[in-house]
């Protein structure tokens, strides 16, 4: 019997993460993005510093002790452009004071007109890229928060160098 010849093209998807890993990355990305739009990272409210008129509380989150730690964590989830959008160099939402990470206590909270979300991984066969599709219920407060529709958001999850990261992202709630 003939020996099969090795193929010169790798099997499509061989190095791509499983759906479960992508969904776990989406959950981490949603949490991290929320630190900027919904509520800050967990805080130690007993350790406060005032800078100008602004009161900051020390961040109390395992593994993220400095601004560099936070930036590194965000870069494990998002493209450089998205990280810069969240954490600009001259930003004031998260600051480092005496070698520790601090942030402003407060946030907008989640959107009460948004309900349950459904998350799917879509693959179109393009190597190194997939889409995370999030469908979220739209609720009407005037109708007892009943579901009156839905919104769909697509986020690209792509291989950039050795990393798999989101290159598009926003909050859905």
Question: Which positions does each model-derived feature cover?
Answer:
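Generic marker of residues within folded, mature protein domains
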Residues: 122, 145-147
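Short, surface-exposed coil-to-beta transition loops
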Residues: 113-117, 147-154
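Short beta-strand edge/turn micro-motifs at domain boundaries
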Residues: 129-133, 143, 150-173
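Ser/Thr-rich, Proline-interspersed low-complexity disordered segments
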Residues: 1-13
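Core segments of small alpha/beta cavity-forming domains
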Residues: 14-104
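Surface-exposed, charged secondary-structure patches
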Residues: 93-140
């Amino acid at each position: 019997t003939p020996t099969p010849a090795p193929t010169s093209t790798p099997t499509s998807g061989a190095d791509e993460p499983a759906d479960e890993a992508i969904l776990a990355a989406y959950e981490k990305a949603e949490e991290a993005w929320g630190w900027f739009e919904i509520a800050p990272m967990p805080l130690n409210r007993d350790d406060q510093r005032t800078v100008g008129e602004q009161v900051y509380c020390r961040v109390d989150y395992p593994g993220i002790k400095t601004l560099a730690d936070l930036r590194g964590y965000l870069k494990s989830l998002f493209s450089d452009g998205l990280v810069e959008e969240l954490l600009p160099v001259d930003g004031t939402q998260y600051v480092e004071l005496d070698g520790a990470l601090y942030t402003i206590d407060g946030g907008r909270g989640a959107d009460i007109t948004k309900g349950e979300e459904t998350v799917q991984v879509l693959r179109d066969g393009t190597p190194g890229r997939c889409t995370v599709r999030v469908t979220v219920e739209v609720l009407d407060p005037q109708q007892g928060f009943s579901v009156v529709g839905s919104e769909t958001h697509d986020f690209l999850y792509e291989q950039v160098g050795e990393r798999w990261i989101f290159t598009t992202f926003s909050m859905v709630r």
